[in-house]
From Swiss-Prot:
Lineage: Bacteria, Pseudomonadati, Pseudomonadota, Gammaproteobacteria, Enterobacterales
Protein name: Large ribosomal subunit protein bL25
Coiled-coil annotated spans: none
Keywords: Ribonucleoprotein, Ribosomal protein, RNA-binding, rRNA-binding
Organism: Cronobacter sakazakii (strain ATCC BAA-894) (Enterobacter sakazakii)
GO cellular component, one term: cytosolic large ribosomal subunit
Organism domain of life: Bacteria
GO molecular function: 5S rRNA binding; structural constituent of ribosome
Subunit structure: Part of the 50S ribosomal subunit; part of the 5S rRNA/L5/L18/L25 subcomplex. Contacts the 5S rRNA. Binds to the 5S rRNA independently of L5 and L18.
Length: 94
């Protein structure tokens, strides 16, 4: 089972996403269920190591969003066109 630490994003938009990526983080979103969608930021290197395992895409993951645990599954992943970098992940609540 994977547990990923996340923080709620304070800023949104292209400029804010670029600043996150330069700080070795990247944006993501959690949606689904009865709760409102939540924009989050994740540590790039930690998630990159986890996503190398095939179970990352098929199992239920635990996101610790500012201390609150949420069960999610990966819905979509956006990657850099030629660098081994993640740009964005969509999570759906499990």
């Amino acid at each position: 089972m994977f547990t990923i630490n996340a923080e709620v994003r304070k800023e949104q938009g292209k400029g804010a996403s670029r600043r996150l990526r330069h700080a070795n983080k990247f944006p993501a979103i959690v949606y689904g269920g009865t709760e409102a969608p939540v924009a989050i930021e994740l540590d790039h290197d930690k998630v990159m190591n986890m996503q190398a395992k095939p179970e990352f895409y098929s199992e239920v993951l635990t996101l610790a969003i500012d201390g609150k645990e949420v069960k999610v599954k990966v819905q979509a992943v956006q990657r850099h066109p030629y660098k081994p970098k993640l740009h964005h992940i969509d999570f759906v609540r499990a």
